[in-house]
């Protein structure tokens, strides 16, 4: 039997070696080889952990409360901190009666938007005193890291009270000019929606909500933005128009018109991002779609004309907006990605063909 200290040593060694290989995710499954995701591609790591009982190791990573949750049939999410201070996001789950885990390796430092190659106009949006800013994209597209870059920029520049509500906490901030309180779902709070409502009583200037998963959280986030706070959050959507539609569709039919009006009154911007392999698969570059809350865009949202948002963004490039296809075209022209890769990630192949 491995004790807690030995479990820590095993996992820390695994993570340290994975970082050397530029691994972003480690997939561990009882009875199978370990798999790595490197620059978006999966590869087997046949020699890794083969001398250990995977069930024992993964159960040993959890505390008593987490093990109880797992034994009750629920997935378990938590942060794992190695002895050198690096944090990882861990998800442990069951598949075919076997235990499995995915470990997401986080950056050891909080990068800037410039380092991430994300449009720095996002900094300008974060200067707004109130409203809502959304960062969207598929799993693994770097949404949490983009938000961390924005929060850290605020921290260095403004005297604000920032409350983050996360599941789990990924990046830990050191208070500089801002006072930052970080709350973790399942540890400090029960859920996003109730934590948001509580945050309104805690004198915040900025509230970061890890994810807007349901109507209760969406409603609380919009209320926070309406009442004079800047709210940052994420959704698992792949474009600005789809993001607006997802928010509306997540609400009961009788509330959708009101939510549409609230969103039109508070939205400051949406950035959608995905990571595309480049350099022969040795690295990845972000492709983004960027929408700002212009009067024209907000009118389309208010009137339920979300199908016209993409066309409006294409004609509003001078104001800093761009669609995903516009950015894919730029990345191709600059030699970052191939036409083949661009076609894999576009949400409208016919439109992209017009650009190239």
Predicted segments with their positions:
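Short, flexible helix-loop junctions that flank or precede catalytic/ligand sites
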Residues: 1-356
